From Swiss-Prot:
InterPro entries associated with the record: GHMP_kinase_C_dom (IPR013750), GHMP_kinase_C_sf (IPR036554), GHMP_kinase_N_dom (IPR006204), IspE (IPR004424), Ribosomal_Su5_D2-typ_SF (IPR020568), Ribsml_uS5_D2-typ_fold_subgr (IPR014721)
This protein's UniProt keywords: ATP-binding, Isoprene biosynthesis, Kinase, Nucleotide-binding, Transferase
Gene transcribed to yield this protein: ispE
EC number(s) recorded for this UniProt protein: 2.7.1.148
Protein name as it appears in the record: 4-diphosphocytidyl-2-C-methyl-D-erythritol kinase
Source organism (scientific name): Chlorobium phaeobacteroides (strain DSM 266 / SMG 266 / 2430)
Length: 294
């Protein structure tokens, strides 16, 4: 291997229902993960040691970085002494609820397992992924829409893609997931709809009456504390989105659009306001790892 570059895609959450809190302090949830066409790029080069550089000087490149932690965890799991020099071209905003760091960690696990030829099993990789972060298993194991429960690590591939244009906006606010879980407005006693069945009705039957059930439980508190995020959602709806929502714990907001014309108009409007924006086409799924290499 001289040099290899791999795309690392982000996600949005279509609905995020917080269902309880475990004895260990972690919250349980149910959500739909959907991939979007917003990605970081990770370059891998031969090295005797594990090292990292990053295009964003605000991100650590030591053991506090998930990519480094993922590489070391894999190395220790396989009792492997091989190394790699990684370069992260950071494009996906952090503190946005898009899972960029988790996706990067999953890419490192998957790619180094192959490059080092250590044959760590899928089950072992899953365990490593869960320890790195609740969203990491999704990026490691799924390509399209997936239902998640538990802390987000219990996954079911739904075999579907969104048949809509998706506009995702970063309002230039960084929101801590820890803050979001401390401040969301708890409502554990409400009935929880089956998001899987509702998603099938939406994607296969075009039944938009189900969209009201796809709530994000972080949204009310985030909107109260970060009013700019609420304005972005309202702007997407004004631009023709038939559904808009916070992604994860925010601050990114996405909107679903029927037509490319309306979606492109929303992208232009958001960019003119100085926001970072991406447009994801209908039917998008994360490419197989070979197809994601540059």
């Amino acid at each position: 291997m001289d040099h290899l570059s791999v795309k690392s895609f982000a996600k949005i959450n279509l609905g995020l229902l917080i269902t309880g809190k475990r004895k260990d302090g972690y919250h349980t949830l149910e959500t739909i993960f959907a991939p979007i066409n917003w990605y970081d790029t990770i370059g891998f080069s031969d090295s005797d040691v594990i090292s990292m550089s990053c295009s964003n000087i605000d991100l650590p490149v030591d053991d506090n970085n998930l990519c480094i932690r993922a590489a070391r965890a894999l190395q220790q799991s396989a009792s492997c002494s091989k190394g790699a020099a990684m370069n992260l071209q950071k494009v996906v905003p952090f503190g946005a609820g898009l899972g960029g760091g988790s996706s990067d960690a999953a890419t490192v696990l998957r790619v180094l397992n192959e490059l080092w030829k250590i044959n760590v099993s899928s089950a072992e990789l899953h365990e490593l992924a869960v320890k790195l972060g609740a969203d990491v298993p999704y990026f490691l194991e799924m390509k399209g829409l997936a239902f998640a429960r538990g802390i987000g690590d219990e996954l079911e591939d739904l075999g579907l893609t969104l048949p809509f244009h998706v506009v995702t906006v970063f309002p230039e606010e960084h929101i801590s997931t820890v803050w979001a879980y401390k401040n969301f407005y708890q409502k554990f006693d409400r009935p929880v709809p089956d998001l899987r069945l509702l998603l099938q009705r939406l994607c296969l039957d075009g039944d938009r009456s189900v969209l009201g059930a796809f709530e994000n439980d972080f949204e009310p508190a985030v909107f109260d504390h970060y009013p700019k995020v609420r304005v972005v959602k309202e702007s997407l709806l004004d631009a023709g989105s038939f559904y808009a929502s916070l992604s994860g714990s925010g601050s990114a907001v996405f909107g679903l659009f029927d037509t490319l014309e309306n979606a492109a108009g929303a992208v232009c409007a958001m960019q003119q306001k100085g926001y970072r924006v991406t447009l994801t086409p209908p039917g998008f799924s994360m490419e197989a790892q070979a197809g994601s290499r540059l």
